[in-house]
């Protein structure tokens, strides 16, 4: 009898933990979607509401105010900034997304965002679309860490700020 009770208790705890993990993962997916949907509306406050107070974006700038500076600069430089989530994978406290990011260069960057290559650069008026991978780490239902891999050189080429790579026929 004792074995049966212990087994039932253990199964209940394990099932509860699995359900909690599933609930947390689903919640994290929803927060990630909200974060990028807010981005598409240039809704900085909506984005900041999804972050922990000490959230890190590549380690700096730290916290919500650091994110606010970055987001202000992105939306000034690219007022039509758009992120399309193409694919999302979530497990536990991590959500990874493959995205198409686009925008039109209409403002002057003031802080080193997007690899720092647009600081002080006059707007080209040109549109870009590149691929990004975003990895979000969550703590207590909020984004605590944001890592991204971007095609900054591809963006700069599309904006006309970096020459195209040499082709075999013209590289001699």
What are the residue ranges of the model-derived segments?
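C-terminal and inter-domain tail/linker signature
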Residues: 19-172
């Amino acid at each position: 009898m004792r074995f049966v009770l212990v087994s039932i208790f253990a199964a209940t705890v394990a099932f509860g933990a699995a359900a909690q993990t599933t609930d947390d993962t689903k919640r994290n997916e929803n927060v990630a979607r909200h974060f990028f949907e807010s981005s598409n509306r240039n809704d900085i406050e909506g984005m900041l509401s999804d972050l922990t107070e000490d959230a890190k974006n590549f380690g700096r700038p730290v916290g919500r105010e650091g994110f606010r500076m970055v987001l202000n600069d992105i939306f000034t430089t690219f007022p039509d900034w758009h992120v399309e989530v193409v694919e999302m994978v979530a497990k536990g406290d991590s959500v990874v997304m493959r995205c198409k990011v686009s925008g039109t260069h209409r403002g002057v960057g003031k802080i080193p965002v997007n690899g720092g290559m647009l600081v002080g650069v006059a707007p080209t008026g040109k549109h870009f679309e590149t691929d990004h991978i975003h990895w979000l780490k969550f703590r207590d239902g909020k984004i605590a860490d944001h890592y991204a891999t971007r095609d900054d050189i591809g963006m700069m080429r599309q904006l006309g700020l970096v020459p195209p790579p040499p082709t075999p026929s013209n590289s001699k």
